Amino acid sequence: MSAVPQPPTPPRTPPPLPRRIRLKLKRIYLDLTGPRVEREWRRTWSLIDPIEGWLMEGQDRWLFDTAYSLPSPANIVEIGSFKGRSTCFLASGCRGTGKRVFAIDTFNGNDCDFGYRDFFEEFSQNVNRCGLSEYVQPVVGTSSDVAKTWNKPVHLLFIDGSHRYEDVLSDFDGFFPHVAPGGIVALHDVSEAWPGPLRAWHEIAKHRLVDVSHCLSLAYGRKPASGTA
């Protein structure tokens, strides 16, 4: 008597992957298939986030997106760079283009706001580690001295140096004539905690700009296309 054939054993369903592995695979998939700007941002943030600085959440992405949106070539002037956190977010938006960030700072701090002096070496190490050296030109000196001999058009001006009212105003007045019509001007720390930038923005800067807006304590606008403001 012949044996009765048995139905084939159904394949065993593999157990689900742990959540952390599924998330990692999702990130890899997005890195390979997502929009280029999103891929660049994810790579940018993980490299730059360890750098010390005072940007609020969301302002890092604003700097990156704004630099990324500029046509190439373009000149970005940053006044106040410290250890390079904001510098690197700006420069990451320049990767693969002819855009450049001019990072103006004494890199020596002061006795009031910093616990130590001379952080140029750490700034340089951070920029190099992020692979952004070709997009960053450090300009060592006071912003007022640099403004006296500046001769390049500026397409994005980011003011985040001394927060004394007179100094913020000096930075604005010194570089605003070089901002190209339609160029962007941004001031950091426009908040009640910092009366200098707050006063300079509300009394002077915002009245010389159009399309003004805020990203938390970062206030910005565009120089009128006519260049008459």
Task: State what each model feature region is.
Residues M1-I51:
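Membrane-proximal basic amphipathic "stem/tether" segments
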Residues E38-W41, W45-D49, D60-A229:
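S-adenosylmethionine/decaboxylated-SAM
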